[in-house]
Structures are given as C-alpha cells and as structure tokens.
C-alpha cells in the first residue's frame, strides 16, 4: 500500500476520543445535512481516485449525508448489514439488472444497521442521500470497487462532533489532490513496467491502495500504457494488469455483451497459465475476459486459484488492430497494435 502524505486527520490519533469530542462541534439543535464526494478524476478521465471523500465522518443521530458522484467511472454508496454476503454488481457479469440488496433503495433511506441500503450505480452529477436515525459506527462500501471503503460514526446528540463541514471539505480537497497525484506517478511506473516486462509489453492499467483510519481508497490509471505499439508479423504482444483489485479486458473487434463470460474461455492457455490468442485479421473479434487480481488472502476462506493478470496475442498478418477495455472504454481506455510485415 502507498502511504498517504500530509494527512489532515486520522482516526485513532494519539489522544483520547473523549478529548476530541470535548473540543468539537456542538449540536445545532436541528438535524443537519452533510456533504461528501464519491470519486475524483483528471480532466482526461484517465486518472481516477476510487475513494469516498472524505471517507470518515462523524455526525449526530438524525443527521443526513448527501454523497455526490464526481466521476464518469461508476460507483455505489452502500451500507451492508454486518455479516451480509457482498452481492455482485449486476446479475450477469457487467450487464443485466443491478443486484443491490436486492435492488437500489430509495434516495433518502434510513440506515440503522438492520437492513441494507444502497444507491444504484452513480455517475458524474448524480447524488444519493442516507439518513442515520440510530447511534452506531457503520461501514461504507462501493459495490463496484472492492477496496473503496469508508466509515460513518453516528453520535448521540448529547455529544459534540470533532469536525465541521468546512473541515471535511478541506480534507476532501487535499485527499483528492493526493490521490490524483499518486495516479500521475503510477503512470510513469506503468510505462516503465511495460518496457521491462517483455519485448512487446503493454501495461493494462495500474493502481495502488491507500488508507486512512476510516477506510481504503485506490489511486488508479485507467489507460493502456504503451497503448500504441509497433510489432512485426509473427510477434506476440503481452498485456499485464497492474491495477490492484480492478478488472480490465483486452477486447478486439465486436465488444461482447458480457465482459465476464463463463469460464473457462475457449482460449489456449500457455504453460505459465496465461491466456493466449492468435489474430489474423483486423476484423477478427477476440476478448481476453477480465484480467486482474481481486482476490485477497483472508483467514477463514478457501484458497483462491492464481489470478489471470496477463493476456497474450500473436499477430499473423499485417494491419492496424484497435482494441479496448470493455469495462472502461467509455472513459478512454483504448489502444492500437500496428503490425508491420
């Protein structure tokens, strides 16, 4: 994990929680609506902060939080019950109806820990509001991105709050800038990795997880690094996904209706476990399936198989071969292989 630089505040700072509250913000006498952001992105959308900003808030019983989506990449605002099995995003891979818990719950729903509350997938400009009628400490998650989490501490009205909205706004601004700066640095690493991994290597996204006391976030580059590559007939190009917990695809030709097809795919697999396709025409359709490393080693769960993080294609004829990530082409994740005689 990357360490967060110049963090404004961290949960668990080296002084008692009672002291924090004693110096904090008193109850105004009426329920308040707090504001937070969901995600951040660069102007070209290629650098994404998969984060709740801020990802830790203290509020009073009866208060409301309104989350505003700030990216073209989709996210959800989700509160699961403790012990609830995390649902998939969609019924069929990346298509079909939204599963939710079940479905999306109405904007302005109450969450007290007894039933799940979730937005539908949100994109830039959309908002979702949750009311908190009961004191407690609640985990916030995004159903799209497994390492995007936060927390909400709901205190009795008799207790003061440690921070006000201005604090959270400043914190969010700083964290947004840091995550996008981290992503800019990752782009250089991804380009270097592409040059070092193989003679004809492409990095299919790169990311790094950061954390505060309230949860985890992800600085991500959603681009093919080495996106335009020149090779000769008979050469093999290798794509490697360096994005922790984020799936990508390498898709030539017609985009499949479902980027998460049934497995195993009808593709040859090299002795080192890498899917390997052969393409002989720019009109040929080939899909890698999702590649990435979502699995986390967790005590008490069965050992997961080795992740598919690479994909290879051998080109047997000259031409211009355009490809996309079927999950993120809408934010510009595209590439080209120029095959020369």
PLM feature segments, named:
Residues 3-15:
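Bacterial N-terminal signal peptides that target proteins for export
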Residues 14-24:
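Bacterial N-terminal signal peptides
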Residues 27-341:
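Extracytoplasmic copper-binding redox domains, predominantly the cupredoxin/blue-copper superfamily
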């Amino acid at each position: 994990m990357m360490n967060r630089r110049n963090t404004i505040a961290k949960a668990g700072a080296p002084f008692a929680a009672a002291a924090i509250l004693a110096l904090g913000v008193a109850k105004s006498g009426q329920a308040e609506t707090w504001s937070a952001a969901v995600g951040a992105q660069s102007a070209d959308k290629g650098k994404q902060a998969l984060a709740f900003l801020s990802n830790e808030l203290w509020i009073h019983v009866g208060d409301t939080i309104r989350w505003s989506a700030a990216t073209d990449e989709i996210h959800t605002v989700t509160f699961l019950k403790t012990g609830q099995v995390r649902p998939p995003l969609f019924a069929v891979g990346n298509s079909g109806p939204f599963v939710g818990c079940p479905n999306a719950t109405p904007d302005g729903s109450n969450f007290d820990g007894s039933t799940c509350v979730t937005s539908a997938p949100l994109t830039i400009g959309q908002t979702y509001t949750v009311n908190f009628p009961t004191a407690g400490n609640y985990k916030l998650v995004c159903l799209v991105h497994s390492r995007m989490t936060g927390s909400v501490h709901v205190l009795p009205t008799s207790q003061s709050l440690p921070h006000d909205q201005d604090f959270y706004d400043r914190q969010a601004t700083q964290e947004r800038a840091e995550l996008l700066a981290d992503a800019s640095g990752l782009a250089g690493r991804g380009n270097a990795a592409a040059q070092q991994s193989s003679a004809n290597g492409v990095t299919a996204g790169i990311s790094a997880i950061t954390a505060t006391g309230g949860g985890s976030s992800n600085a991500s580059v959603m681009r093919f690094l080495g996106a335009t590559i020149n090779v000769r007939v008979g050469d093999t190009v290798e794509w490697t996904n360096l994005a922790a917990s984020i799936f990508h695809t390498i898709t030539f030709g017609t985009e499949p209706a479902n980027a998460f097809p049934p497995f195993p795919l009808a593709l040859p697999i090299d002795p080192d476990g890498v899917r390997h396709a052969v393409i002989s025409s720019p009109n040929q359709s080939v899909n890698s399936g999702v590649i990435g490393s979502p699995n986390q080693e967790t005590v008490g769960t069965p050992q997961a198989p080795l992740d598919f993080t690479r994909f290879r294609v051998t080109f047997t004829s000259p031409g211009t071969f355009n490809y996309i990530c079927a999950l993120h082409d809408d934010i510009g994740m595209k590439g080209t292989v120029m095959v020369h005689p």
